[in-house]
Structures are given as C-alpha cells and as structure tokens.
Curated annotation (Swiss-Prot):
It holds the Pfam family Herpes_Helicase. Belongs to the herpesviridae helicase family. One of its GO terms (biological process) is DNA replication. It comes from Human cytomegalovirus (strain AD169). This is DNA replication helicase.
Length: 956
C-alpha cells in the first residue's frame, strides 16, 4: 500500500485522537507497574532492626561552647529521655544556653527501603503511571514542587480537602526550616559527625547516615516538635491516645507506597530523609504499618536529563547566598553503584519513550535523542533551523504578544517586562495598574537578628536596606524578581497592634456594630493577631511598615506560586462558550461533590444576571422581544412567592421600596450594610447594570425601570417580573437549588436558540459578562467594583498548574472569603487590602485572596519571626525563566537564549523546546544546537545501557 496520498483526494478525518491511541497502546505495560509496586511493597523489616522507642535516643544537646563532641556527651542532658518533664527541661535549658541538638550516629538504626525508578521523555506518560497507581493501590501521592503537586491534584480530580501536597509538606517542612536548611554554619558544624568521606560511602548504611546528616538541622527541629507533642499528650492522656494523635501527624502513616513526582528536582539526600520520616512517624504513632513491619516503597518519577537539583547556602554575616548544582535523586539512583545494587535498579526501572504531549513525529524524534543523550544527527540540527526568528522580533513585546517568552535568566525576564510596561504606557496606559506590597518588620526580632549575625557590629543595618537585599528570601524569588517593582521603599512606624485594637474597640462601642474590613463573619478578631506559634510577635513590641509597589498588566497571562484561596464571582467570555458550559455541565462536573450545592447556586446566580442580555444585545429587535416574551417560565416556589409579595407591597414615600431595592441579605454578613440611598461616584467607567438589581434613583425626574414597564410591556422582561433574585444557599434545600438551576438553564437555552435562529447565528459570538447576583462597574484604573460594595460567590482555589488571565483588582468586600485579619497587623487592614481578579480558561472570574507569609529567620540555633509580608502570590506567564517553565504545557512559546549564552546546557534546550504542544507555535532567536552547550554525557551511558537491558521495562 502506497504511503503517498493523492493530492486530489481529501485526507479523511481520523476517528480517534493520536494522543488517545498512544495512551491505549501503552496501557497494558503501565498496568505491569502496579504488579511491580505490589511486590516491592510486601517487603518486611526484621523485628530486631529497631529497638523500643529508638527515636528518643538518636540525638543529644551540645552547648555551643563545647568543641569536643565526646566532652559534650557528658554535658548533655538528653542522651536518653525518660520523661516528658526531663525532656522539656532539657530543651528549655539548651535553648537558654545556646545549645544545639546534634546526632548520635552510633545509635542510629539502618532504615531499609525499596525504590522504583520511573523516567521518560517530556509528555511521554509518566503521569499516566501515577494515575494508574492511585486508582489501583493505596498510596501517598506527592510532588517535589507546588506546580507538580497541584498538577497531580487536577489530573487525579482530587477534592479540595484531599489536595496532593509536596513531599516536603508531607514530612513536616514549614517556612521556618528554609534558613535552617540553608545555614552554612550548621553544615560546617555537622561535617565532623560524618562517618566517612563521600568517596568512602561503600555501603548503604554509610551513605544513609551521611545523607541524613546533610539535612540534620531540619530533621532535628521536626523531631523535637513531634516528641514534645507526643510527651504532652502522654502526660495528659494514655500512651495509646498519644500514639493515636501522632498517627494523624503525617500522610506517611497512611501507606508504605510513596509516589514522588519530579524527583529530578530533589537532592539525593532527600530520599533518605523521606525514608527516615516514614519510620519516625509510624514508630511514634505505633501504626498498623509499623506493627506489620512494612518497608517503605518509594516511587521516584521524573527525568534526570531535563531537570537539575540545586543546593544553596546562606551566610548571615555577609548576607550572601551561594547556589550550586547538586546530585538529584534520579541521577543518584542511576549512577551511584551503592544505590544501584541496593535498590536493584536494573530490575526496578520503568522508562517511557515517546512524547504524547506533542504528537509531531519529527519533533518527537528530536526530543527522544535529546532526552537520552544520543548524539544528534545533522538532520536534527537542520530541523531546528525552521524555528529561528530574528531576535529583535522575539524581544519586541508587541510581536506575537500571545506567545509565552522563555529566557535563561531572571535579569532577561525583568528587562523584557520593563520594555513591555514602557510600551503599554505609551499605547494602552489604561491596562497598567500598581498595588502595594506590605512588609511588617518586628523591630525587636530584627535587632536580635543583627546582634546574632554580627555580634561585633556597632549598629544594625538599616531595615529597608536589609529588606531590599533579602527580598528574594523574604518573598518567593521567582514570583517577585521577574515583576516590575518600585525602586522606592516607604518606611514608617506602626502603632502597637494592641493600641490599634483598643482604639477600634472603643470606636465600635461608640458608634455601634462590628464589621469585618476584608470579609467573612465580622466581629473584632484583631486580637488573634497575637495568637500564632512559638515565634509570634509580642503584643507590646514596636513594628516598622515597609511598602513598595508592584505593577501589573490587565489582560496578561499569569499563574500562582501555590494553591491560593479564591472566590468564583462571575463569568466573562462569549455567549456560545457559556452555553457550551451549560449544556455539558462543565462547571458542575469539575466541582468537588461536597461543594455541589454551592456550584448549582453560583451558576443559578450567573444565569439570573445574564438574562438581561437578551433584551439589551445589539441585535435585539421588537420582533425578537415578542418572541422572547412567549418563552415559557415555569413556577419556582421559592422565587415566585417572593415576587408575589413584591407586587403586593405598598408604595413607599421615600422612593425606595425595601423589597424592590433591598440590600442583599448576603451583603450584611460583613457587618457593614450599604444603604440604598448611598451614592457611588465614578469617573470613566463601564457599568453592567441589571435593572432588577439596580439601586440607582439619582434623578427624581428620570423615568424609573418600574415606570417604564408600566408604560410599555414590550420592553419589560417577564423573567424579572416573575422571579426575584435567588436567595442565598442557606435559605434553600439542595433539591430547591437544583430545581432553580435547571429551570434557569432551560429558559436561558431556549432564549439562546431563539436568538440564534433570528440573528442567523450571530448572537453566539457576542461577548457576555455576568456576575453572581451583582451589578458591576469597571473603572478606568482596572478596578472592578460592585454597586453593593461587596461580592458573593463560591469558595474555591486557583492552582499553580493552570494559567489565568489578569482582569484587574477589587477593593470591595468578598463575603465568601474567610477573614485573614488575625495574621495581618490591624493598621495595615485599616488601609484596605485589594484583591486581584483572575479569569480561568473557561471564562470564570475568581477573586484571589491576599497572600500572607511569615518570615522566620534562624541564627545561632534560634528562630526569630522577623517580619510578615502581605502580597498577591502572583507570577507571570507572559514571560518566565526556562527553569520556571518546568512541568508546564504551553500552547505558544518564544525562546530567547541570548546573544552569547554562557553555561548553556542541553537540559535548558530540552526543557524550553518540550514545553510546546505544537511545534508550529515554537520560535527561537537562535538554533541552540549550533552553539556550544554542556552535554549531560555523564548519565548517558547508564541510560543507553538500560535501554539494552532486558530487565528494564520500556513503555512506548
């Protein structure tokens, strides 16, 4: 059969999608992974491997003045802890005396484990194996990055209460451990406890001890915290109750099968850290897994050639942070002979071959060569030439603005944003807006930090200078270094939080009422600002407020750095897209089942607000209005009864009928109801006004909506005459909510079909903007404002795995978002906190909650809560570094490798090119394969050997 089709014969449309065929072809072998994991997870450790409560004697306290480890042993009070009282006393004594908890490596048992290696090209189906494991086995699913974890949550369709976490969160890592892990002094101190030099790690026992020592400061802190909690529980209850409480400490107690995605970004020693904490938590809780002597089975998923793990060290004295490449888990399992033999990698390696993200054969063949380090052919290099475009075009923000720019460094990203902002200021200034970023510094903690970091210093460094130098550590580096930040930092003193609260309380008592500034249940919860953890600021401490401003672009492509709480309040898109969502129940289907009632209520509110569009569209004629009036409107008891009461209500002399012009019951939940007579002053603005929701009666001579309806029934929408605004979910049963939704949906679809028929299909292409039970005003400075002063919607979250469009910001109260005031200084709250508004791929609008983060610094073994930042948790998808794009699928990509790139690596080239889903939408400033680049040749022989090994499981 000839493979050349006739030019006159049209190519038949394939019955099945290429990606589906590729996934089906690999399904059988993917199922074998389940059998392999089952076999590995059946391993048991021997009863004599662990002594009773071994975890209580793995460390001791050494005073900082002691230089001799053996001498310190006799001075320590916690070699073996026999009671909760002695443990607490020792911990307190060590803290006061500047003691450091050091390991007793001679008392450490060996922690056995099993490992399965799952690698492959980008988009080859590694995630499919995780889906199969999650569906068939009881396992703990994690990722090394937030993006990887949230991507798995979306793929596995996890509910909001069961989101996939990062492996660091699973074993107990929190923000205050960042400086502990980075401390150069701690790592230098622990060098003396190593059992051997790296080249002498000839046994798995030696390797495990040295790897755990590399992370010991964090391990010791987590262990101390858990032991103190266990001892407090044991003192107040039985040992069994204490064990049961500890069993809920970590997901590592749920299963001995632990899946870690994107392991190529995790340093080698983290594998042993995960193994250690599996045994620690299960031994502490005396769980079923520990009683059955289950050995942990770690499934390491990722690509060793497209990622690299970095390790950093921070010096408090010089305030310098050094970053260098480390050995990642995947490379260690592939190259380290000790791990290869112990884990039997030859028999426990699954390799995915073909790229399913992009099904172009030539492009997939190129990626395969790059992934496995096979020498490239000349035709591969020539093939990449087709993607080259002039550098000036790629660096011009106005050229191919829909494409995501990828750069090697943050400096290049920042330069691109500056060019973009300058260009927008000239042509589309209305798209730019800036918002404040707050940093509340505790003066006492900062002073103590300066004294610990530089005891001989004459005076502490100015706090604003310290903030500028440590901005990358205080606030997420990738999030902020790419944005256009103001060069000026405003510094001002804050009143003590207790004084602000007292003033507010006296004001409330004088004027009456409570109220919440940023939404939720109201009341005065500022006092909770003092109630946090062991590093919380004292109520009487003085604080300094540092403020800088960050510039955003309306309509730009953005993402978030972590799962962020948000509220769905509206929809913005085309009428056709909205109808498609209704017909397929797309929004309902993607909502977790426990939130189903809220989803039905939200879409009902959107439908109610969207009904006005049929009467105000540019295509609406009198003939269409007559046809629309004939559409059947079924009775909905919960809405029609209220409508009847409205019609029967007497006229009010004040011109404001409390039924027609009521304040929404939802809007009073914040404690500050908006009077109907209160006017809103707007400059240049666009108003989406739904007549039945309008509260405006500014001109006494103007004809009101009600009067207009009295004069002509043709322009009176019978929908709004029959139904009142849907009440809140608390007033309806689930059945009533679903009935209301189906009724509104059917009416909307019938009206849509009628308009499509009468307009010849043109109505579907019109833009549609609808908000949940609200009238909305778009101001010239990108501010979105509700005419009631508040928004109401469904509580949800936005994911780092998704891309969103920035629509602006709002300063209005968001009633569905719980208050975060207890974490923010009350004086900052009084200034008002703006929230960003994002639109997802379907068109739904989210109000993003503010991001509040506490920066805890560790110096000389002491943790200090130095500052709290309030920002927006946003990262740009318009432009980013190649490293930041790891794990993302992008539709259109423009890569700028620079004019004379230094330290260019094959991993950079591979990650940048493999992000795109279609090579037709890829462009680069140069052909990087024609430039000198660092090849990952060290690991290539091992991969080639595995490809030829019959024991390796290959999945095409």
């Amino acid at each position: 059969m000839s493979m050349t089709a006739s030019s006159s014969t049209p190519r038949p449309t394939p019955k099945y999608d290429d990606a589906l065929i590729l996934n089906l072809s690999s399904a059988a072998k993917i199922e074998r992974i389940v059998d392999k994991v089952k076999s590995l997870s059946r391993e048991r450790f021997a009863p004599e491997d662990f002594s009773f409560q071994w975890f209580r004697s793995i460390s001791r306290v050494e005073r900082t003045t002691d230089n001799n480890p053996s001498a310190a042993t006799t001075a320590a009070a916690t070699t073996t802890v026999h009671s909760s009282a002695s443990s607490s006393a020792a911990a307190a004594a060590s803290s006061e005396a500047g003691g450091t908890r050091v390991p007793c490596v001679d008392r450490w048992p060996f922690f056995p484990f099993r490992a399965l290696l799952v690698t492959g090209t980008a988009g080859a189906g590694k995630t499919s194996s995780i889906q199969v494991l999650a569906a068939n086995l009881d396992c703990v699913i994690t990722g090394t990055t937030v993006i990887a974890a949230q991507n798995l949550s979306a793929i596995l369709n996890r509910t909001r209460s069961a989101q996939v976490k990062t492996i660091y969160r699973v074993f107990g890592f929190v923000s205050k451990h960042v400086p502990l892990a980075d401390s150069a002094v701690s790592h230098e101190t622990l060098e003396r406890y190593r059992v051997c030099e790296p080249h002498e790690e000839t046994t798995i026992q030696r390797l495990q001890i040295n790897d755990l020592l590399a992370y010991w400061p964090v391990i010791a802190d987590i262990v101390d915290k858990c032991l103190n909690m266990w001892e407090r529980k044991a003192a107040s209850a039985s040992a069994a109750a204490a064990a049961a409480a500890c069993e809920d400490l970590s997901e590592l107690c749920e299963s001995n099968i632990i899946v870690i995605d994107e392991c190529g970004l995790m340093l080698r020693y983290m594998l042993q850290v995960v193994v250690f904490f599996y045994y620690f938590y299960n031994a502490l809780g005396d769980t079923r897994l520990y009683r059955e002597r289950r050995v942990p089975c770690i499934i390491c998923v990722g690509s060793p050639t497209q990622t690299e793990a970095l390790e950093s060290r921070y010096d408090h004295y010089t305030q310098n942070k050094s970053v260098r490449k480390g050995v990642d888990v995947l490379s260690a399992l592939i190259q380290n002979e000790v791990l290869i033999n112990y884990c039997d990698i030859a028999d426990n390696w699954v390799m995915f071959i073909h790229n399913k993200r992009c099904t172009d054969l030539d492009f997939g063949d190129l990626l395969k060569y790059m992934e496995f380090g096979i020498p490239l052919k000349e035709e591969h290099v020539a093939y990449v030439d087709r993607f080259v475009r002039p550098p000036s075009s790629i660096r011009n923000p106005s050229y191919a603005a829909e494409m995501t720019r990828l750069f090697l460094s943050h400096v290049e990203v920042q330069a691109y944003f500056k060019r973009l902002h300058e260009q927008i200021r000239l042509s589309e200034r209305h798209r730019l807006f800036d918002l404040p970023v707050y940093c509340v510094v505790n003066n006492r903690a900062y002073q103590e930090l300066c004294e610990l970091a530089d005891p001989l210093g004459d005076s502490p460094q100015p706090v604003e200078l310290w903030f500028r130098q440590n901005l990358a550590r205080i606030i997420n580096y990738s999030q902020f270094v790419d944005h256009n930040l103001s060069s000026e930092i405003t510094k001002e003193a804050l009143r003590p939080a207790a004084d602000v609260v007292a003033t507010n309380n006296s004001s409330v008592q004088a004027h009456g009422g409570g109220g919440s500034v940023i939404g939720s249940t109201g009341g005065n919860d500022e006092t909770a600002f003092f109630q946090d953890d062991d590093t919380t600021t004292a109520p009487d401490s003085r604080e300094t407020l540092l403020t800088l401003r960050i510039t955003y672009i309306k309509g730009s492509s953005v993402g978030v750095n972590s799962k962020v709480r948000a509220c769905v309040i509206g929809y913005q898109g085309t009428v056709e897209r909205f109808v498609d969502i209704l017909q397929k129940d797309t929004f309902i289907e993607r909502t977790p089942c426990e939130q189903a009632a809220y989803a039905y209520s939200l879409v009902s509110g959107l439908l109610f607000s969207a009904m006005y569009y049929f009467y105000v569209s540019p295509y609406t004629t009198e003939e269409m209005l007559r046809e629309l009036a004939r559409v059947e409107l079924p009775d909905v008891s919960s809405l029609c009864a209220a409508a009847a009461a409205t019609a029967a209500a007497p006229a009010w002399s004040g011109g404001e009928n409390p039924i027609n012009n009521h304040v929404d019951a939802d809007s009073s939940q914040g404690g500050q109801s908006v009077p109907v007579s209160q006017r809103m002053e707007h400059g240049q603005e666009e108003t989406h006004d739904i007549p039945c929701l309008s509260n405006h009666h500014d001109d006494s001579d103007a004809i009101t909506d009600a009067e207009l309806m009295d004069h002509t029934s043709l322009y009176a929408d019978p929908f709004f005459l029959k139904y009142v605004k849907p009440p809140s979910l608390a007033l309806l049963s689930f059945e009533e909510t679903v009935h209301m939704y189906t009724t509104f949906r059917d009416i909307f679809l019938k009206r849509y079909q009628l308009m499509q028929r009468l307009t010849g299909g043109r109505f579907a292409t019109l833009p549609l903007v609808t908000y949940n039970r609200r009238n909305v005003v778009f101001k010239a400075n990108c501010q979105i404002s509700s005419q009631t002063g508040s928004f109401v919607g469904m509580l949800s979250h936005v994911s780092p795995a998704q891309t969103y469009t920035l629509e602006g910001y709002t300063s209005d109260n968001v009633l569905s978002l719980p208050s975060d005031r207890h974490r923010i200084h009350p004086e900052v709250v009084q200034r008002g906190l703006s929230r960003l508004v994002l639109r997802d791929a379907l068109g739904f609008l989210f109000v993003l909650d503010v991001n509040v983060s506490r920066f805890v610094e560790s110096a000389q073994g002491k943790s200090l809560h130095v500052c709290t930042t309030v920002d927006y948790g946003l990262t740009s998808r318009t432009a980013m570094t190649i490293a930041k794009s790891q794990g993302l699928s992008l539709e259109k990509v423009a890569v700028d490798f620079g004019d004379h790139p230094k330290n260019l690596k094959m991993s950079h080239i591979y990650v940048a090119m493999s992000r795109v889903t279609d090579p037709e939408h890829l462009m680069m400033n140069v052909n990087p394969l024609r430039l000198p680049y660092e090849k990952n040749t060290a690991i290539t022989p091992y991969i080639c050997r595995a490809l030829k090994d019959k024991r390796t499981t290959l999945i095409f």
